[in-house]
Amino acid sequence: VHKAKDFLAAKGYSLIMKLTDFKAAELLDAINTMSRIHVKCLLVVMDTEENMSDQLISAMHRSGLPIMLITSKYYPLLEFDCIHLDEYSGIIMGVQHLQKRGYQRIACISDRISLSRVTVFKQAMKLQGMKVDPQLICVGPERAESGGYLRTKELLSLENPPDAVFCCYDQMAIGAIHALRESGLRIPEDMAVMGFDNLTSSKYIEGGITTIANPYEDMLSVAVNILTKRTKNPQMSQQQIALRPNLVVRHTT
């Protein structure tokens, strides 16, 4: 948020923000609200593909505003500028790293909001010639640290638990680490833990969590640059840009 504010300020714009809590109805309301108060342009950050509804697309078109989307998936048919995070390549990097470290029974834990990453995880495992054990795919309603803790406890209750767990984001990885420590297990000797997003806190937990780092600062800089150009030149060609994440190896693998 602070970076977005700084990038916009450098272009002579102020930031008005509305949180949507990853809910489709809240996102739709945000689009309609911003349209009513006559903002100059819209930067829409979407975390789940389920939010990309026909109703939302219609609302964005009706607004008549220059719009930049930041998504986790490529939408080639949309008529808006878009930057998408190449989560596919990031998750493949993560699975490859765990495989190279010798881990074979790799679990994946997620909440219901991050299911797109679970789908990519399964694809990455198959691409690497590794078996996807349905018992090792744990998805539940709880989010963040509590979700990571509870899903890891479920994995530990299995007769044949995993030797590594891929967490769909870093907060879940923090919860997973707590569950493993509570059970007296060593990280990464007994079980490795990998996160996703590279939150600031991830470098301070358990000597540092191995994670996939999304280029958020570059993403915001490019998004603001394109969006502010669009406000001055509405007829410029549509921009579709993919940014790749990086693997950050730390202590938990």
Indicate where each model-derived feature is located.
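Alpha-helical recognition/docking segments in bacterial nutrient-uptake
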Residues: 1-96, 100
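An alpha-beta-alpha
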Residues: 92-128, 135, 239-252
